[in-house]
Amino acid sequence: MRELWQEDWTLGALDVSPARRLRFSALLAKVQLASIAHATALGAGREKTLDRGLLWAVSRVRARFARVPRYDERVRLVTWPGETMHALFPRYFELLDGEGRQLVLGSSLWLLMD
C-alpha cells in the first residue's frame, strides 16, 4: 500500500496564465511544496536534511495532461513516493478534478545533495 499525501486547491490568479489555464510552473511549485510536506510527515523533513547540510533537489519532472484546469477550478493534488533507486528518489503525482477525474499524471525525480 502506498502512502498518499493529498491537498485540495482552488486555482487562483497567480496559478493561471492570461488565458486562465493552469501554468505548468504553478503546478510544479504546488507539487514541490506538497512533496516537502509529505516528506516531513514521513520523517524526512528539515531536521533530517537541511539542518544536517543536505538539500532535496528536483532533477526531472514529467507530466501528461488529460485536460488543463482553469481559473477558480477546485482540484485535488495527490502525491506519493516511489521505490528509492540508490541516491535517486522518485515521486509520483496526479491532479484530479472535482469529480475525481484525472487531469494530470506525473512523476518527479529527487536527489539528496550534500
Please describe what each predicted stretch is.
Residues 2-3, 62-114:
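HotDog/MaoC-like acyl-thioester-processing domains
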Residues 1-58, 113-114:
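Hot-dog-fold acyl-thioester-processing enzymes
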